Amino acid sequence: MVYNEIGKTGMKVANLAFGASSLGGVFHDLREEEGIRAVHTAVDNGINFIDVSPYYGHLKAEMVLGKALKEIARDRYYLSTKVGRYGKDGVNTWDYSAQRATDSVYESMQRLNVDFIDLINVHDIEFADLQQVVDETLPALVALKKKGVVGHVGITDLQPENLKWVIEHSPEGTVESVLCFCHYSLNDDMLVDYLDFFEAHGVGVINASPLSMGLLSQRGTPPWHPAPDPLKEACKRAADFCTEKGYPIEKLAIQFATSLNPRIATTLFSSTNSDNVLKNIRFVDEEMDRQLVEEVQRIIGDQMRVRWKNS
């Protein structure tokens, strides 16, 4: 792995990062001890950036991650969590008010067993009034930064144009990083179109979901996936082609996301399986088959950059 700085934050992170959504049992049933072991495996093998949210598993991911972090020295990792999107008893909720954002940070720290958050993000801003994010949510987080409770402030969303709008309408330097998912992967590289803008504003870029939420998988797209059917079918053809070549599409997708653009500081993946963690790290360290990338993208064809709504 290589280590890149997230914007101007001073945080130098491995180009592969651990996303803790799976610790909430988001994708399948979770055995806590396996999830904790996966976190330890990631950190022990060079991954030093961990991202989570109170939304993942409706608090469960933060609680399980907190148990894992108890056993890891605080100077071995950077920790990122979020405010704005929540859930309880299986019902999703959103609250981007200043008071809720402030309270949420302290609640997250308690669950995570830490007294400092390196990066705090406004989560999935497309569900918010973007003007409220600018006028209320972000100033609340900046106030916590001034108090030394958090180190840096960012925003996250599926739609990169929303990230751009909030940066344009906020005081310069307010937003220090963006996290965008499913837009720098084999089937969608739209994030590249925004990198000049982010760089011009000193904003670091974090990529997430290199497998496009399961589109790029030998197992096939999960039934809940919101992508349109033609895109699902194109990605299935691409995955089958990679299997025939003896080169799993998951491997190619991880390599694509982590190796081609140094302006993207890191890419998040999520797993509760220690063997998968080690496998993904090995993928990053191996040379990518660039010709196969071209062949896969030809198969995806007119479904490249096809989008879907967040949910």
What do the PLM-derived regions correspond to, one by one?
Residues D29-A42, S97-L112, Q159-I167:
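Short, acidic/polar
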Residues I125-N310:
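Beta/alpha (TIM)-barrel catalytic core signal, keyed to glycine-rich beta->alpha loops juxtaposed to Asp/Glu
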Residues M109-A128:
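Active-site groove signature of glycoside hydrolases
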Residues K8, D44, A68-D75, M109-N113, ...:
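Acidic (Asp/Glu)-rich catalytic clusters
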Residues S21-E33, K88-Q99, A128-D129:
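Active-site mouth loops of central-metabolism enzymes
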Residues I6, F18, G35, I50, ...:
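Conserved, mostly hydrophobic/aromatic
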Residues M11-L16, G46-N48, A73-Y77, V114-D118, ...:
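Short, well-ordered coil/turn segments that N-cap beta-strands
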